[in-house]
Amino acid sequence: EMMNYPGVLNKDPEVMRKIEAAKQAGKPIDGHYPLATGPKLKAYIESGISTDHETIYLEKGREKCELGMHVLIREGSAAKNFDALHPLLKEYPEQIMFCTDDAHPSFLNKGHINRMVKKSLDLGYDLYDVLRAASYNPAMHYKIPAGFLREGDSADFIQVNNLKNLTIQATYIQGTCVYDGEKCTLPFH
């Protein structure tokens, strides 16, 4: 996450070395520039930064998407931007992702990305656009080889009760059930 947006805009040599190292490693570079706009936003994106999870205003989100940036709609313990940004889900479904940020355990006990999925469906958004923001877009953007269910892939998936409520009944990682609807069976170290 490149939080030093002044360093990016001023082409600080250390900042630019970090960005170049991420590019050379084939890693996406996450942004942190909530109020960016105009030429500064364009320069920020042109430096190689591909996402922002700090967007708080709908118009800023639209501008970022228009310039090719991916916007992460976040719901965390402190910042909650879903209500302001959810229209982007219909307008730019290929560029929107859901995320949590600084989520406390008590917050996560009430749900994670699935909370935003349910809120989106309750608002009438297309199921496939919602699932795309919850899983496909992040997996593709971050090159996470999970959840595609292709032959030879690791069997990482969830089982839900139906396509309306999407209540998680089981979670599988590498083909092994790690959550059975009641308890997690992952070993904690």
Predicted regions and their residues:
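Histidine/acidic residue-rich metal-binding segments in metalloenzymes
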Residues: M2, G7-L72, S77-F98, L108-L123, ...
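Active-site microenvironment of metallo-dependent hydrolases
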Residues: L108-G124, Y128-H189
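Active-site glycine-centered loops adjacent to acidic/histidine catalytic or metal-binding residues
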Residues: D101
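Short active-site segment of divalent metal-dependent hydrolases/proteases
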Residues: H104
